[in-house]
Amino acid sequence: MALKSKPGIMNITPGSKISVIRSKRVIQANTISSCDIIISDGKISSVLAWGKHVTSGAKLLDVGDLVVMAGIIDPHVHVNEPGRTDWEGYRTATLAAAAGGITAIVDMPLNSLPPTTSVTNFHTKLQAAKRQCYVDVAFWGGVIPDNQVELIPMLQAGVAGFKCFLINSGVPEFPHVSVTDLHTAMSELQGTNSVLLFHAELEIAKPAPEIGDSTLYQTFLDSRPDDMEIAAVQLVADLCQQYKVRCHIVHLSSAQSLTIIRKAKEAGAPLTVETTHHYLSLSSEHIPPGATYFKCCPPVRGHRNKEALWNALLQGHIDMVVSDHSPCTPDLKLLKEGDYMKAWGGISSLQFGLPLFWTSARTRGFSLTDVSQLLSSNTAKLCGLGIVKEPLKWVMMLIWSSGILTKSFRCKKMIFITRISSPHIWDSFFKEKSWLLLFEGLLFISKGSMLPNQLENLFLYTLWSLVKPVHPVHPIIRKNLPHI
């Protein structure tokens, strides 16, 4: 008997096995159409015209006008396990991701102990993640001074690419690189089709600023001016054009860097750029004194800058939107002192990215296909998961409501799933949404309820890359990692 004979999701429960999904709004590439999606053995076997699938006994999920798209892939998540699991761990991070419609994350190489800067450390990370993940997980490696001999072995072990800092990272075990280090690393990566991610801020020669009131956000903002990003982005653009190694600028904050980015792309540089939900949602003018949970690096800038980022995103100069989910324990935020200059920088938004983005994007000329492109397709291409997670091929689907809702809600701590929450940041920012997640044909999450045994249905992705030629293959490690 079909699970549902009429549109709706109210009676579907986690654990239900679905064989047909029917929707009037299925996103495939740049099109939206009415379809019946046929699922067999955890894969989509065919996509038929709406209402054409009439097989007796099919377990049909008819979602009516709800949007069906490939799950969101977030390539910028700091999980911090092992070593700093009290900041964030695989279990809580991946549960939060699932609650936000994210079906895969890519773990950043720093803030865990050890960092992912060697093959040995990478395997330590894999062990820590074993049987803890509620969504698929891939991993970035790290580039630090003098670890160039580890880069190709880490690629062969399965990292999705690499991340480096051009400025102090905040943790001693992940030092920033020099220009000389970058030449060495990029020489190693030539011909691999790997990607190098840059935290793009550079220390610049500037007069020592007057010491202002450290509880005022403007004091912190003045300490990280646009010029630091501009200088770093110019360096990345130059190196990208010189070596023809894929380069990616993470968490772009300053819209003043966009001219450099546009010119580099026009010149043929293999350069991509991301910005974050907090840069698109927050403005420095509205950050109160002492509210250090708003601190991140690069900083949230002014309203005009925010609107320029939105415009660049609409024009295609920025390629994707990510969370840069980077929690820490409350003591490191120095909430009592309210000291922006000394507090740890990082914002938690992992489970709220989709409603944050769509609530603002739909008023600025963005379409539903843009949502899929910016939050799923382009992020998959960046980290190589497009190889194994082609949209609507594997059943890692998100079903959600894009309608205009009149009910806004305040972001209370109780709805946060991440280990450390900052509910005040997202108060009144978005409208309530409901969604379902389908993993390999099995309904995992429905309106907040989760399937408890989801841990056995997932992959840790290790993406093999050979130096000459590059030959990426499918993920080779099941979630239970039996041979590690």
UniProtKB/Swiss-Prot annotation:
InterPro entries per the UniProt record, alphabetical: Allantoinase, Amidohydro-rel, DHOase/Allantoinase_Hydrolase, Dihydroorotase_CS, Metal-dep_hydrolase_composite, Metal_Hydrolase
Gene Ontology CC: mitochondrion
Primary enzyme class: hydrolase
Post-translational modification: Carboxylation allows a single lysine to coordinate two zinc ions.
Entry note: cofactor: Binds 2 Zn(2+) ions per subunit.
Binding site for Zn(2+) 1: H76, H78, K163, D324
Family under the similarity heading: Belongs to the metallo-dependent hydrolases superfamily. Allantoinase family.
Name the record gives this protein: Allantoinase, mitochondrial
